[in-house]
């Protein structure tokens, strides 16, 4: 039997008029102030945010573990009008998993991202939007992560990492699609389900 599989990679860039702070506020269902645009982004009325967490390398300055400080610092570091502010994985959880199992699966995925790239990851699990007629089992997560890694001083490094850039981006995305499918199957098996996903 097949379980649900969805994994996509998106970019959040200023060139499209987007703000990393606004995106983070929406995904976490919080009220954050975006210093770059001088705007308050209030999504506290948004329902269906099941879980949020910020994952970061151990030596990260503690101020960067605060959602508002983190994304405002990202906005400040990127001066160009077309700057790439963050990347995002959008994933769907197999419908078989419960809240605790979804959280464990998200933790593993985000910790892998931190380990591989040394970046800060801001993740949120959302309940399905049942009013829009979507499949009600489709719990999904938005996983935003920084385009710069954390250096030995616990701050953003001067250079952006290139893994997702034009040269080897396709390969990187294929790798993550594959490892996400493996992660889904591992968690399905671990929790006693026969269903598997195929990417």
Spans of features found by a protein language model:
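N-terminal nicking endonuclease/strand-transfer module with a His-rich metal-binding environment
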Residues: 1-199
